[in-house]
């Protein structure tokens, strides 16, 4: 029975030493590692940007179709920004009157 315990303790000691050795080596190498790439982050940002562009195009097209159904043959006025509540200027064309002022 003494030999079994001795072997178990030896295996445990080897496991602990190897574990320490692995971490010690990686901690020494860490400053010389290549920095992590931003490829994944950039891919997500590009996908989000183009999703927004496509969403805006679809929203504007639906707005135009709805306006043409109600006012056939007329020029579609500019669409007011959805998520921007501050002042905005229009240099060419006319801005849409807000709901409160049109009543």
UniProtKB/Swiss-Prot annotation:
Q: Please indicate if the UniProt record lists Ribonucleoprotein as a keyword.
A: no
Specify where it is mainly localized: membrane
Subcellular localization, per the record?
Membrane
Membrane topology per the record? Single-pass membrane protein
Q: Which UniProt keywords apply?
A: Membrane, Transmembrane, Transmembrane helix
The transmembrane residues are 38-58
* CC annotations in GO: membrane
Xref: InterPro entries: At4g29660-like (IPR037759)
* UniProt-recorded name of the protein: Uncharacterized protein At4g29660
Q: Which organism is it from?
A: Arabidopsis thaliana
The gene designation is: EMB2752
